[in-house]
């Protein structure tokens, strides 16, 4: 988002922004909302029978049978009305429409924001340099799923022809946070529903003791490593990758038979033959959404 409060000048005649981008604290409805701080005593609101009724009322249905429940948040009808007024003044709906239609929403870096296209097509096709981005993301998702299914089925195996049992991700920042959060959130559910496939570990700390501890906890011969770096030049990630490659080599293993890359099509990793495969992402999806 832009840090200023002036209208954004588009970088391309076909990429335009109709909404006005201003900091929230310049909006009158923001001042009204700020004045409602501590308006709701959540401990009282959630107690007794009124708490149960609140849980029923402050819930919104989502896809796949999920419910978003915000009963434990410090809101009531007054606060919700103030939030709606802020959304209107900030042109939230207009900006959301511009986002899914491919406008330059990340005005600081002059980029579109397209992580939503990894899930579905909400608006008009978004085409960049002749490439339909929805089709591109779906193709990469299919490539990743096909690779994972082959690993699970024992079609992609280690040098001894044995199945991989552990996957270790090497990344930093959002590229670590997103996959780690998903794994933590879904691990127990997958085990309870008999869909758990492989144990996952994560290396993100550049302290070699951290990487060494992770490697000591896995059987290297049966471990598959995913190197995640959009640019392919992230120093911390490449440092940890080198550490892992050294450990694999010392164990008598060929690192190229144990590694795959998640990167951009233009990165050095994409052109390397040191990986089993490469899954591509681009500059329009941030690291934490790349999982």
What are the language-model segments listed below?
Residues 1-17:
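Short, Lys/Arg-enriched N-terminal segments with co-localized hydrophobic residues
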Residues 3-4, 115, 247, 286:
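Tryptophan-centered motif/residue detector
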Residues 8, 15, 111-114, 266:
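Generic N-terminal initiation segments characterized by hydrophobic and/or small/turn-forming residues
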Residues 13-18, 46, 287-291:
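Short, intrinsically disordered, charge-balanced linker/junction segments flanking boundaries
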Residues 15-17, 44, 216, 249:
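Polar/charged alpha-helical tracts
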Residues 146-154, 161-291:
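Glycine-rich phosphate-binding loops that contact phosphosugars or nucleotide phosphates
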